Amino acid sequence: MQFSLATIATVAAAVSALVCPYTKRDAVAAFTSPPLSSADHKSCPADTPVSCSSGAGSADLCCTESPGGVLVLTQFWDWTPAIGPDDLFTLHGLWPDNCDGSYAQFCDKSMEVQSVAAVLQQLGETELLDKMNKIWIPNRGSTDSFWTHEWNKHATCMSTLKDKCYSSDAPQYQSLADWAHTVVNVFETVNTYKFLEAAGITPDSSKTYAKTDFLNALNSNFDGKQVHISCKSGYISEVWYYFHLKGSVVSGQYLPIDDIGSSSCPDQIKFPPKDGSGGTPPPTDPSDPPTGGSKGFINISGQSGCLISNGNWYTSGTCATYTLGESQYGGVTLTSSKGPCDVVNGKFSCASGNNAGQFTQDGSNIVYGGKSDWSAPSVPSGSQQVGVSPGSAGGSVSFNLVFAAK
């Protein structure tokens, strides 16, 4: 029996579809780490351990990011009010999370600056600034205050950006310029809007999209790794890309990994355009504090007592009144009569000399650095005051800090 070439081709195509049923759209695109370099940063050997690997803890911290070995590139979709170009998820930042998903913040006051824009101007980075003003835009406040917040909160926790990692004749704040270039370069490798558009997912005020389709479109352009998406009231709000890193933040290789968080998006996602046709803004999330601040007590779950005004746990007196405020760039602040609250030397503290720490909420629980659990060495008795710490570092007594509104 003989078959025509056309018949053979048809059969071959059918067999191919059975063996490999994925369409071209479903094919996984290899992620290419951006070419990064810094003339002033310490050179790193080729066998530098990958962050969060078994050898990372004992490696040269100028060449292996630790403990913040998970780098997270984050993007906004701000549609009401519209922020940035209509066809761009704008840049939020690049964050060093710990390998367990927790994170540090505002780690090194000696690295903090008053103005990222002024530093970049001083270093002659006008072209970089022009680009940042188009793609790295906050939904409130000035661009410079936003960039400065990102540097002071996140970049000061990056071990590979310390002064000791740079040559002695490097210009002052060269690490900041290298960091800004890196954040922009990594951002440009993950164009969320184009990834979605190629899969037929575009902003539409009358449609919803399946969460699985959203994720497939993003994952297939990220080495098949799971991308993180966040929603507010069913509307897409942020997209996060997770990496491990081989080498320094400013000259290393970014290696995609799976999302280590959990998505807040429903099965059907709204993706409104930035032209104002997307309807009314979503209602405030239950976890968002009132703009004017909310007053209440901070109780200890499963235990007697509460926090007093200096931030210590006390069981024999009156609970302090805390004000829960809205932090300018996400999260919440806490203030008592003693002053702003923060985690200082590993313990929750409220004092007039403190910076206003950035906390978040999980329901009524107070979260710091991604950790909703807190700890102390013992339960206080009598007139004793006991300090509390985020995570398990404070001791064997574990609990949540619960904000109870008055």
Swiss-Prot record:
Residues of this chain annotated as glycosylated in UniProt: 299
Chief place of localization: other
Span list, region Disordered: 268-295
Lineage, uppermost ranks: Eukaryota, Fungi, Dikarya, Ascomycota, Saccharomycotina
EC class: lyase
Source domain of life: Eukaryota
Keywords recorded for this protein, A-Z: Cytoplasm, Disulfide bond, Endonuclease, Glycoprotein, Hydrolase, Lyase, Nuclease, Signal, Vacuole
Gene (UniProt): RNY1
Compositional bias segments (type: Pro residues): 280-289
Disulphide bridges, residue numbers: 44-63, 52-99, 62-165, 107-157, 231-265
Biological process terms in GO annotation: RNA catabolic process
Entry's family note: Belongs to the RNase T2 family.
InterPro entries from the UniProt entry: Ribonuclease_T2_eukaryotic, RNase_T2-like, RNase_T2-like_sf, RNase_T2_His_AS_1, RNase_T2_His_AS_2
Subcellular location: Vacuole lumen; Cytoplasm
Record's GO cellular component terms: extracellular region; vacuolar lumen
Protein name: Ribonuclease T2-like
Active site residues of this protein: 92, 150, 154
